[in-house]
């Protein structure tokens, strides 16, 4: 029980944004990704804190398990159902603008009584830069007329680079999830091919033995030969 509680606490710590000790204001925006095993006949929900007037993108994929499908729902902090999907292998949904509070994401495998599912999902927030921090940084430098390159150009270049790097990380994460799903599917297909190949070989051997026995009976004379 202690190990299970520690695992749940670690999962929540990885998913929920960290709140600074002794700091005021809303929690900082953080992207998150998580992979978990959803047992057969079970439903599992996660909660993600979000600030107001932001953009939240949710992507999920079923990367393992028979059928590669799951039911998905997304609820707002007020309990309003925003997204409801049934028996889907993947999905991408965007909430814009967001409400301040905890969004609820649920994955349901109740329709499956045997097969468990391996589910990957990712939460992506649009990054917003603190205007006061930007203004303070700009005031700390020399006047723009004394610089060869304007501060706005530098900030724009840095912001563009940061956005592209974040998007590259997100795309690599999704590609890794696709690769895991394809690998699991290929391994399942390999097991099926090996099983049915062995079954066919066994049937062929059985048929060959039966044919030999049948032919031997045709040539076996049961009548005694008089001497």
From Swiss-Prot:
Membrane topology listed for this record: Single-pass type I membrane protein
Signal peptide positions on this chain: 1-23
Location(s), subcellular: Cell membrane; Endoplasmic reticulum membrane; Golgi apparatus, cis-Golgi network membrane; Endoplasmic reticulum-Golgi intermediate compartment membrane
GO biological process assignments: endoplasmic reticulum to Golgi vesicle-mediated transport; Golgi organization; intracellular protein transport
GO CC list: COPII-coated ER to Golgi transport vesicle; endoplasmic reticulum; endoplasmic reticulum membrane; endoplasmic reticulum-Golgi intermediate compartment; endoplasmic reticulum-Golgi intermediate compartment membrane; Golgi apparatus; plasma membrane
Domain GOLD: 43-125
COPI vesicle coat-binding (motif): residue ranges: 218-227
PROSITE patterns linked: GOLD (PS50866)
Coiled-coil ranges per UniProt: 145-170
Sequence motif COPII vesicle coat-binding, location on chain: 218-219
Family: Belongs to the EMP24/GP25L family.
Subunit description: Homodimer in endoplasmic reticulum, endoplasmic reticulum-Golgi intermediate compartment and cis-Golgi network. Interacts with IL1RL1. Interacts with RNF26; this interaction is important to modulate innate immune signaling through the cGAS-STING pathway.
The protein's name: Transmembrane emp24 domain-containing protein 1
């Amino acid at each position: 029980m202690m190990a299970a509680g520690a695992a749940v606490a670690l999962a929540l710590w990885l998913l929920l944004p960290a709140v600074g000790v002794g700091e005021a204001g809303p929690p900082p925006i953080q992207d998150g990704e998580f992979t978990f095993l959803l047992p057969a006949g079970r439903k599992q929900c996660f909660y993600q804190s979000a600030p107001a007037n932001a953009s939240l993108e949710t992507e999920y994929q079923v990367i393992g398990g028979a059928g590669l499908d799951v039911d998905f729902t997304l609820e707002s902090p007020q309990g309003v159902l925003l997204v409801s999907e049934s028996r889907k292998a993947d999905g991408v949904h965007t909430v814009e603008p967001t409400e301040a509070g905890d969004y609820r994401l649920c994955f349901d495998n109740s329709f499956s009584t045997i097969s468990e599912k391996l589910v990957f999902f990712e939460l992506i927030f649009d990054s917003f830069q603190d205007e006061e921090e930007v203004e303070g940084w700009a005031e700390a430098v020399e006047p723009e007329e004394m610089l060869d390159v304007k501060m706005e150009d530098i900030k724009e270049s840095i912001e563009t680079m940061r956005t592209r790097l974040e998007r590259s990380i997100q795309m690599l994460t999704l590609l890794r999830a696709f690769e895991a799903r394809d690998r699991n599917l290929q391994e399942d297909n390999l097991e099926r091919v090996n099983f049915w190949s062995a079954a066919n070989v066994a049937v062929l051997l059985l048929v060959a033995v039966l044919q030999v026995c049948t032919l031997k009976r045709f040539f076996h004379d049961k009548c005694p030969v008089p001497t």
